[in-house]
């Protein structure tokens, strides 16, 4: 009597897994001009960031920006650089990944940057080594912009397109109107608001060229066509960064108990001479000081991690400008960084997709 043949069924050596990719913009490796130049070249060579013709972009970058800006930007980065941990945007993002990893248990969590390090390639390698055949991608930009979310996803798919083993991808959409994000903003900001007791609140979002806002409007007739274009989300402005920013501001104001005259929405960090969305933060805060406002509290709800735009542009330069114009104090509300309410919110955004 012969024995039954052994089973030839394949036994997996490891269980297929779902992983998480947290995706942020990036940062130079150091404030040194060479590192800043390398970062700016990569960032500003992106046609979704400088959305002008290729020749014009090359000339603007190589003849105007790169010869002078790396030194100036490097000096600004040096003011916020931590001697031990380096770039605030990087270490806050790393801390967030650590917190999310701890909360999710055995779910692999990787951090990747659109520009600089850790690269998207290295993050995907990390998830592949963890045997992830499905990846949930969370772009850490609350409001959609082609120059941030769009660019990051385009680069992610470009990299994936060169790989032999491509995981299933599930992208979390912009979360500007997600209750977990809205609650986290209020949880982090409300204690600062109560302690500082401002006489006015600024909600300062990163700016964009007006042309990029118009490009996001499929109707071609809504965005920036009238003053009320961002009063509510509609089909025409569903992908409009400015409309999404105003939505975030309205909800945050409501959660803080602010009336319509207690806060102002504005946009910072404009570059070049082309029209950028208004009102501009640097002009608004001076006007408020001249109008008699003395204590100004600033939220930056487009940035989930503190960075050059919050720590240097607002907490240092904007504060100096406000006080020079007659104000007494300006306080920056910290970004969400890796605060417990934000870690909880990220987990809440991810959990239904796991």
Regions found by a protein language model. Name each.
Residues 2-354:
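Active-site-proximal alpha-helix that buttresses catalytic centers in soluble enzyme cores
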